[in-house]
């Protein structure tokens, strides 16, 4: 019995990170972790991060950038550590900032807009996929501009505040 208890303490630390989130949120984090754990060894490492960025279309990520991400963890990144890191980042996080950061992953130049076709592709093929109807509803409510770009900064503002920016 003692080895099991010791293992749990190592994995989970002294606080129960699982109590910070609802069960549905934990399941979503588990899906994200599984997507990022490219080699399916139960840990996210540098190669997993590089492969994840490549899958998202960012192939020229600097080693330093990946090293900085890995250094944020107190040790090997298993699911419990992953969940703890997100819990710490999201504690008191502004929902607008959280959603913006999700879009910024796809906008490394920081333009504030993305090609609508690219957004449609990402939302229908990655993680928790949107249906065609859901995408059509989103673009009906927030149509792209004449060049086919979606102003995601304005979209996020409307989602979180219910009104357009001035």
UniProtKB/Swiss-Prot annotation:
Keywords (A to Z) from UniProt: Calcium, Cytoplasm, Metal-binding, Methylation, Motor protein, Muscle protein, Myosin, Phosphoprotein, Repeat
Outcome of mutating residue 15 to A: Loss of cardiac myofibril assembly. Loss of phosphorylation. Loss of calcium sensitivity of force development. Increase of phosphorylation. Phosphorylation at Ser-14 and at Ser-19. Phosphorylation at Ser-19
PROSITE patterns: EF_HAND_1 (PS00018), EF_HAND_2 (PS50222)
Top-rank taxon, per record: Eukaryota
Name recorded for this polypeptide: Myosin regulatory light chain 2, ventricular/cardiac muscle isoform
Localization per Swiss-Prot or TrEMBL: Cytoplasm, Myofibril, Sarcomere, A band
Further comment: This chain binds calcium.
A single GO molecular function term of this UniProt record: calcium ion binding
Residue span, EF-hand domain: 24-59, 94-129, 130-165
Intrachain S-S bonds: none
Effect of residue 19 to A: Loss of cardiac myofibril assembly. Loss of phosphorylation. Loss of calcium sensitivity of force development
Modified residues (N,N,N-trimethylalanine): 2
GO BP, one annotated term: heart development
Species per Swiss-Prot/TrEMBL record: Mus musculus
Gene for this chain: Myl2
């Amino acid at each position: 019995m003692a080895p099991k208890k010791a293992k749990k303490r190592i994995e989970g630390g002294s606080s129960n990170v699982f109590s910070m989130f609802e069960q549905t949120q934990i399941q979503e984090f588990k899906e994200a972790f599984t997507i990022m754990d490219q080699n399916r060894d139960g840990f996210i490492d540098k190669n997993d991060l590089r492969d994840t960025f490549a899958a998202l279309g960012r192939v020229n990520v600097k080693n330093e950038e990946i090293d900085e991400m890995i250094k944020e963890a107190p040790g090997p990144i298993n699911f419990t550590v992953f969940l703890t890191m997100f819990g710490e980042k999201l504690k008191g996080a502004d929902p607008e900032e959280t959603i913006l950061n999700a879009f910024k992953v796809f906008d490394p130049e920081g333009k504030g807009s993305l090609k609508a076709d690219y957004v449609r592709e990402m939302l229908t093929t990655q993680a928790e996929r949107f249906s065609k109807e859901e995408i059509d509803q989103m673009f009906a409510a927030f149509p792209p501009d004449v060049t086919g770009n979606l102003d995601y900064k304005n979209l996020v503002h409307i989602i979180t505040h219910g009104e357009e920016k001035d």
